[in-house]
């Protein structure tokens, strides 16, 4: 649901009948007004018993969305980035990016991969320091601080953006090196890539069908699920430029919400829904 000045709501229903769970999430981005103390992204999740419609929980949708979105992006980065990557450009250094890059580096180290990784960070209100602090104990993570998007993206093997509001492309085509992977978590700022990248991967075709250049890149688009199931190839060489619109779908929210709810060791709040057929 689009609003003025780039604000919006996303309404995301989902049902998993085998688990007897249904969910509706509403999450939106709204510019912060003067004097407000909140995140620009806020959301809530309603969790239901799917066979009765009884509400089981009202949950913080922002926290769950941040976790699953960042982890989905990190998974995409591991899946589609060229194996010999060295340099990662990061734009939008907020909560989602924090989850994403922590998960990305942690997954490398968990597999015994101690390679040197250079993170190129855009300078913005000191946010770069938060990312640098995450890896102060890892001597193989290095940093380059950049003042322009051209510096961040140019020469990077992997580019991840988590900016939630942008009105134009970050850079022109020549800054995307051969073999790079681009993951625009919030889908913004890389519309020019739709026109010349070699491969596009997505978690849900319907989510991107309304994109301006969908008809142009649809023939080279593959569902990530098909790659994971072995039904389609992922990256096939080190020269393909790959664009990934894989940032999580409602079923991921449901899985996170159901698992958190199942582990909640707190008393239930009474829910006084009507138990009478006639209540008027």
Residue locations for each model-derived region?
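NAD(P)-binding Rossmann-fold cofactor-contacting core
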Residues: 107-135
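Glycine-rich adenosine-cofactor-binding loop
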Residues: 73, 84-107, 122-127
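N-terminal ligand-binding/catalytic initiation module
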Residues: 1-66, 74, 84, 222, ...
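Short helix-loop-beta connector
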Residues: 80-87, 177-178
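Rossmann-like adenosine-cofactor binding region
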Residues: 141-215
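Adenosine-phosphate binding glycine-rich loop
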Residues: 193-280
């Amino acid at each position: 649901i689009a609003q003025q000045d780039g604000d919006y709501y996303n309404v995301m229903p989902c049902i998993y009948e085998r688990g007897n769970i249904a969910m509706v999430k509403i999450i939106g981005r709204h510019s912060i007004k003067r004097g407000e103390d909140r995140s620009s992204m806020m959301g809530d999740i309603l969790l239901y018993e799917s066979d009765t419609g009884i509400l089981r929980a009202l949950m913080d949708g922002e926290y769950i969305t941040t976790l699953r979105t960042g982890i989905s992006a990190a998974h995409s980065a591991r899946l589609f980035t060229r194996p010999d990557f060295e340099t990662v450009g990061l734009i939008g250094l907020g909560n989602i990016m924090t989850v994403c890059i922590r998960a990305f580096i942690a997954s490398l180290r968990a597999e015994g991969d101690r390679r040197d990784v250079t993170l190129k960070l855009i300078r913005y209100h000191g946010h770069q320091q938060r990312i640098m602090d995450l890896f102060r104990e890892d001597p193989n993570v290095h940093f380059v601080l950049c003042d322009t998007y051209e510096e961040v993206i140019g020469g990077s093997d992997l580019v991840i953006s988590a900016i939630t509001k942008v009105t134009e492309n970050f850079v022109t085509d020549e800054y995307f090196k051969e073999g790079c992977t681009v993951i625009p978590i919030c889908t913004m700022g890389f519309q020019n890539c739709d026109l010349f990248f070699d491969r596009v991967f997505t978690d849900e075709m319907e989510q991107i069908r309304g994109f301006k250049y969908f008809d142009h890149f649809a023939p080279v688009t593959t569902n990530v699920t098909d790659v994971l199931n072995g039904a389609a190839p992922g990256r096939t060489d080190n020269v393909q430029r790959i664009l990934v619109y894989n940032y999580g779908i409602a079923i991921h929210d449901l899985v996170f919400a159901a698992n958190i709810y199942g582990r909640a060791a707190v008393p239930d709040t009474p829910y006084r829904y009507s138990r009478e057929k006639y209540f008027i």
